[in-house]
A protein has these predicted regions:
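Extracytoplasmic
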Residues: 22-56
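Conserved small/polar residues in nucleotide/adenosyl-binding loops
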Residues: 217-218
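Cytoplasmic helix-loop-helix junction between adjacent transmembrane helices
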Residues: 119-153
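Residue-level signature of mid-helix packing/kink "hotspots" within the transmembrane helices
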Residues: 39, 67-75, 159-160
Length: 218
């Protein structure tokens, strides 16, 4: 290996570290919130059942509607991401799913729950594959598997954080006259909205649009 080749290789590694620290922590937090929001209905189900008389069959059908909408909208969502750009579209996904998740606090029966679960699936569709597509814009193929593996740390982190957090929020039962499950949906939905707005300032569609140095050959 020549000195010039070694210098280029070191520059590439340094750039990859800069890219990783710039975008991965933010995307990991976004995905962590997505997983927590996706599972909060299970945590809320006992209190919701007491208040609304919802059976296990109702919750099962509501969950199936979430995944039906998710798969139905996933491909169109990713096509839209290519048209509008990753920054705007990931922001749109997060803001809409945060609003829908928070809005689930106001369901009054099985049919309104069905509607909200369907809307949540449609709103969240495209986020995970969209992030993977976004990473391909920034990372040469040699680095993608490692970076995706780091990104996936959000899954065990969400499982570790989500249950205790949801338990604490359910403990707000009676605060300001609202049930714990109301607070669970509202307070776990708000971070997605805030992170969605932050996407507009934190993310950049492609390396050539970055305002910070990205000097490697993709």
């Amino acid at each position: 290996m020549t000195a010039n080749t070694a210098a280029v290789s070191e520059l590439e590694r340094a750039t990859m570290r800069r890219v990783a620290w710039r975008i991965l922590p933010f995307l990991i937090v976004c995905y962590l919130i997505a997983i927590i929001d996706r599972g909060n209905i299970g945590m809320a189900s006992l209190q919701m059942n007491d208040d609304l008389g919802l059976s296990a069959r109702v919750f099962g059908f509501a969950s199936s509607l979430f995944f039906f909408a998710y798969f139905l909208v996933e491909v169109p969502s990713n096509l839209a991401m290519q048209k509008f750009g990753a920054r705007i579209w990931i922001a749109r996904i997060m803001v809409t799913w945060g609003l829908v998740s928070a809005g689930t606090a106001f369901v009054v029966g099985p049919y309104s729950l069905y509607v909200m679960c369907f809307l949540l699936g449609a709103a969240e569709a495209g986020f995970f594959p969209g992030v993977l597509l976004y990473l391909t814009y920034w990372l040469p193929s040699a680095y993608r598997a490692r970076m995706v593996a780091i990104f996936m740390v959000a899954i065990p982190a969400a499982n570790f954080i989500g249950s205790p957090l949801s338990g604490l929020l359910l403990g707000l039962d009676g605060w300001l006259g609202m049930r714990g499950w109301h607070w669970l949906f509202i307070l776990e939905g708000i971070p997605a909205v805030l992170l969605g707005i932050a996407c507009l300032f934190v993310l950049t569609d492609r390396p050539e649009h970055a305002k910070w140095p990205v000097s490697y050959t993709h």
